[in-house]
């Protein structure tokens, strides 16, 4: 019981990172700690953005921090929750079949979409923010309980700064740069 309690506390940790969040309106930071398992280009995103995007998929192992952070400053303009299955998070179909929660963030220059996806162990997607709430870059807004994956959709003209296999840290690692006009 003691070991289980220690792991439970370890798993639900949310380290403070406010002092070292990368500055700049053009930078998009990782929404989660984990490993980049896919970077796709020209993905048609119809849920919120309605355009071709880059999709960055981040797998969260049971050893990663499972709190999710806002990739950029903005306001939550879209929010949805979908019940679903609990397939392993590394399967390609999880984004369509598993339980998931999505938020669309309207930024000063462009919009992005973040989807939290539950997995075989992760049975709950939790959001602490509501539609209309403002978010600062790196601010905590949700959690996937017991690991899974996070998908980040960013505009197609943005520069991608990560590749498959990279380790990222939520609120710290720059995953993309917007082209500001």
Give the location of each predicted region.
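Contiguous, well-folded functional domains in the mature portion of proteins
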Residues: 1-181
